Amino acid sequence: MRWRFSTLEIILLLLVVAGSGMAYAWVVYGGGGLIGATYALFMCMPILAFERHIIFRRLYRRIHGSPTPAFLLSSLAVYFIFVNVGYAAAGLLLHVAGVMRESRTDAMLPSLNVLVYALATSGPIIFVLRVRELLGRDVFLSLLTGRYRKPVQEERVFLFIDLAGSTSLAERFGDLRMQEYLGKLFAAMADPVLRYGGSIDDYVGDAAVITWPYDRAVADAACIRCVFDILEQIEADAHRWQKDYGEVPRLRAALHGGTIVAAEIGVDKHKITYFGDTVNTTARLEGLCRTLNRQVLISADLLRRLRPPVFVRAEDLGEHEVKGRGQKLAVLSLTAGSLSGDGATEPAGETVRSPAAEAFTSL
């Protein structure tokens, strides 16, 4: 699991934790800000790293898969251990460095007040991070700053990615097992989406809606790379899917971009939502995957504005009627480059010609 923060967010997090330690030292002891900051970082950062799946990932998954009472008790026990070990490590470091005048034992054993402080400091930070994770980074920051209090028109790219054969899987697995299956599938998408600067806007049944600002999506074909990274990750873990569920996910994906209107809606529950033909067209394009028997489709409008990765082949499928759209949509299929029959590699990043392919000669 990748570290899910930007460099600026990491710096701010460190400053908040260190600042709280300095404040505690000044209030309780009347000084020693550096010592307080050191203790705070050593005690709180392991807890935050654990909550962000950076350390002890298996233990984290096991705890979060437990019933609520066991989850609460186990979490508190882990936090208690982290605080004590962190305090002891900080105390030993400060004592060896000659900063602490107390005995080594006193420097390494936390008082009850210190334990309460550590949990009181970590708790609100963990709460904010969980809200951030629930909403997504971009949505969290947009809601926090009120960016979309008034409707804003902007250009975005959307990726609709859907699980093929979900109905038969649900009948075979049952509701609970199917939800677990979908949960792991969506979790597998998280890292590629973050890696390529996207954000998961919503989950609709067995489908995920992923979006980027237009410039970010077309830069180095990030939106296309994201799709194939997701597919590659599923394929790489095929043995695990087969072992755990007896079924490897088969996905369909559609990419399209254009002008939309973004707005913050709701009173008791707020949400940033996107309106416009672009969103509807992407959803219809994903439906064409089934009709055309293709795994990944992209609109010609979007493909014109980016350069596909060298490992991707684009096959022109012509123009197709899209429900709710007044004009036909030019569509292409994307596949990872493969070997032809004579062992030669297909021209990567090029469009396979068909009568309507001339529009893409500039790619």
UniProtKB/Swiss-Prot annotation:
Q: Could you tell me which SUPFAM superfamilies the record lists for this protein?
A: Nucleotide cyclase
Show the InterPro entries listed in the entry.
Answer: A/G_cyclase, Adenylyl/Guanylyl_Cyclase_3/4, Nucleotide_cyclase
What this protein catalyses is: ATP = 3',5'-cyclic AMP + diphosphate
GO terms, biological process: cAMP biosynthetic process; intracellular signal transduction
The enzyme's main class, written as a single word, is: lyase
Region Disordered: start-end pairs: 341-363
Q: Does the keyword Repressor apply?
A: no
Task: Please tell me where Mg(2+) binds in this chain.
Answer: D162, D206
Q: Where is the Guanylate cyclase domain?
A: 157-286
Per UniProt, what is one Pfam family of this protein? Guanylate_cyc
Task: Print the keywords alphabetically.
Answer: ATP-binding, cAMP biosynthesis, Lyase, Magnesium, Metal-binding, Nucleotide-binding
Cofactor dependence is on: Mg(2+)
GO MF terms listed in the record are:
adenylate cyclase activity; ATP binding; metal ion binding
**Superkingdom of the source species:** Bacteria
Enzyme Commission code: 4.6.1.1
Cofactor binding comment, as recorded: Binds 1 Mg(2+) ion per subunit.
Concerning Gene3D superfamilies, the annotation shows: Nucleotide cyclase (3.30.70.1230)
Family label: Belongs to the adenylyl cyclase class-3 family.
Function statement: Plays essential roles in regulation of cellular metabolism by catalyzing the synthesis of a second messenger, cAMP.
**What's the protein called, per UniProt?**
Adenylate cyclase 2
User: Which organism does this record belong to?
Assistant: Rhizobium meliloti (strain 1021) (Ensifer meliloti)
Gene that specifies this protein: cya2
